[in-house]
Regions:
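Conserved alpha-helical positions within TPR/SEL1-like repeat arrays
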Residues: 22-32, 56-67, 90-101, 124-135, ...
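Structural marker of alpha-solenoid helical repeat scaffolds
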Residues: 16, 50, 84, 118, ...
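PAPS-dependent sulfotransferase catalytic domain
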Residues: 170, 204, 224, 238, ...
Length: 486
């Protein structure tokens, strides 16, 4: 008897005995199996009307709303199931999964931990907890859950994938590759395992391995857009830009997919290299539009960084600086030089030249200055006016603590250069705390700097979000150098 025949039989049974909630529950299951989601919800609700403590019916309704992408109703019904039965593992796990899918990591963690208390060795829960830890950058915690999985089932491929992901984010690419290879071996039909390993080979510039593995991928998944994307990237790496364009213009991904950002970015750079600026600019614009609408971009606010610049522009004026209390500074333990400038202005080239000198050491792009100034009293620039020697010594110590994470300052013959271009906006604070500090300002033609920032694939933060639009990049340049020049 097929599902539709079973539905008709159950309808007859319900008509004869309309108060048996089990029959409604079973009918709801059949409607779900035949993809009649709205009818299934309606019948499960009738089941609940007959037995209001039927937590399984609430769980099934929640899953149906999840399928219908009605997340709020799904969450509400999972919570109703849990309220009736606080130890109902399925609903607790499912609710954790919903929160994970919508990137509510705090709530997903709470529900997965509760699920684990009920079924301690539930592998999907352990794996999802690891994903939560990865997304909240608690990598060691993530490894703990993944190693627990491997003790239970050493052939669970997603655990190795996620271990690889952790090492990817930690920039330990060789360990990343080892674990991605294990995932491929254990799950040879899963395109995602191959995709991850291709990405790791590309990131680590292991182009021979990248090329050889790509040949295998093309045999297994000849028409897969991800494989074609990597074929285009490899052609780009081999400077075959026209072939890259041919590869990448015949595929596309969902606009919310990071692969679509990557595809447009490589097309932009390829057109740039073959001197077709209009096409290049078009694809750079598309890349940035996609980035601006990505999930990651929602975590950042370009206006916050602009406001930080404007706040300093408004404060560091002669009228305010004239009010500063005179201080008898003690000699700093550090002989400090700051390498600053607008991004893409040549600071990396200067870094390469300077670090070739045996008596120069570069601390590259570390948050030494921002950590220090975050400790200024009440984070208020006006407190620089009457700052005390004790407060200055405290701030210097905070800087030195960060400094010593990367270099030992005991050798007085060494010149240490703190290189972070956008420290240019903190020069006022730096000079109030280290009046003997020196600055190397890297300058490039403004048009080149701004355009280069617009074309660059920066990791997004509040500052870098200003480079997704060329007019925002221009305004940022103008405001920063107005601050510098005043």
């Amino acid at each position: 008897m097929n599902y539709f025949d079973q539905i008709e039989e159950l309808k007859k049974i319900i008509k004869a005995n309309p108060n048996n909630f089990v029959n409604y529950f079973n009918l709801g299951n059949l409607y779900r199996k035949t993809n009649q989601l709205d009818l299934a919800i309606k019948i499960y609700q009738k089941c609940i009307n007959k037995n209001k403590n039927n937590f399984q019916a609430y769980n099934n309704i929640a899953n149906l709303y999840k399928e219908k992408k009605d997340i709020n109703r799904s969450i509400d019904n999972f919570k109703l199931a849990i309220k009736i039965n606080p130890n109902y593992h399925n609903a607790i796990y499912n609710l954790g999964s919903i929160y994970l899918n919508i990137k509510d990591y705090r709530n997903s963690y709470i529900y997965f931990i509760n699920a684990l208390k009920i079924v301690p060795n539930h592998i999907p829960t352990l794996n999802n907890l690891a994903v939560v830890m990865i997304n909240t950058k608690k990598y060691n915690e993530g490894l703990k859950y993944l190693n627990q999985i491997i003790k239970i089932d050493k052939k669970f491929a997603p655990a190795y994938t996620n271990i690889g992901n952790i090492y990817w984010y930690k920039d330990e690419v060789e360990k990343c590759i080892i674990n991605y290879k294990k995932s491929v071996d254990l799950n040879p039909l899963n395109i995602n395992s191959y995709r991850n390993l291709l990405g790791a080979y590309e990131k680590s510039n292991q182009l021979n391995d990248y090329s050889e593995f790509l040949k295998l991928c093309k045999k297994k998944f000849p028409d897969n857009p991800i494989i074609i994307l990597h074929e285009g990237i490899l052609n780009f790496r081999n400077k075959n830009y026209k072939k890259t364009i041919e590869n990448l213009e015949k595929i596309s991904f969902d606009p919310k997919d990071l692969f679509e950002i990557k595809r447009n970015s490589f097309l932009a750079k390829s057109y740039d290299f073959i001197n077709l600026p209009d096409s290049a600019f078009n694809y750079f614009t598309k890349t940035n539009d996609l980035s601006e609408n990505s999930y990651d971009a929602k975590n950042y606010d370009k206006k916050k960084y602009i406001n930080e610049v404007l706040k300093r522009k408004n404060y560091f004026i002669k009228e305010n600086i004239d009010k500063w209390k005179k201080i008898n500074y003690s000699k700093s333990n550090l002989n400090l030089v700051f390498l600053i400038g607008f991004p893409r202005s040549g600071t990396t080239l200067l870094d390469t030249i300077l670090r070739s000198h045996p008596k120069i050491k570069i601390i590259e792009e570390k948050p030494l200055v921002t950590t220090m100034i975050s400790k200024i009293k009440n984070k208020n620039l006006k407190n620089l006016e009457n700052i005390t020697n004790d407060e200055i010594n405290f701030l210097r110590q905070e800087y030195q603590k960060e400094f010593e994470k990367y270099e030992n300052p005991e050798n007085k013959d060494i010149v240490y250069i703190d290189k972070l271009p956008l420290n240019i906006i903190y020069c006022g604070e730096i000079l109030r705390i280290f009046p003997d500090a020196k600055f190397i300002l890297s300058l490039r033609h403004p048009l080149d700097s701004v355009l280069s920032c617009f074309m660059q694939d920066f990791v997004l933060n509040n500052a870098m979000a200003n480079f997704l639009r060329i007019d925002d990049a221009t305004k940022l340049y103008e405001n920063i150098f107005n601050l510098w020049n005043q």
